[in-house]
Amino acid sequence: MKNLKENLLPTFNQYILPNGMRIIHEPSASKVAYCGFAVDAGTRDELENEQGMAHFVEHLIFKGTAKRKAWHILNRMENVGGDLNAYTNKEETVIYSAFLTEHFGRAFELLVDIVFHSTFPQREIEKETEVIIDEIQSYEDNPSELIFDDFEDLIFRGHPL
């Protein structure tokens, strides 16, 4: 059984930097790599008057940094066949990239720039507000999403999740 476990389960290495940031690494022979930042902040952390902010910020971080406009952010990984994306859930906000291993430096530098140097341009805030409103309306028109939300409310009553 031990041999089976060793062969099937991935081996993760974990490092904790002096600033508390945790790095998790899984060695792989694949030519495709994934890199990202998971921020321990999601919708559960929002106060009632802040609902939707985590998701809003997730959208806005792609809209500009101190050295890049939105177009440059979106095309930086696409130009080399990579992908750049993000998502927000109740527990976390994640921004990540998938790319050929030879482009690790490019992906990591871009992610660091986005996570630590986003500028949140006013004109983009106004545009993205409309996008988020459309997403909310689409979500509210989806019965399965509404049922799932009601189910979670019953299970986690009185809990941030």
Feature-to-residue mapping (PLM):
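His/Glu-rich zincin catalytic helix
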Residues: 1-73, 109
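Acidic/histidine-enriched segments that form metal/cofactor-coordinating
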Residues: 66, 73-161
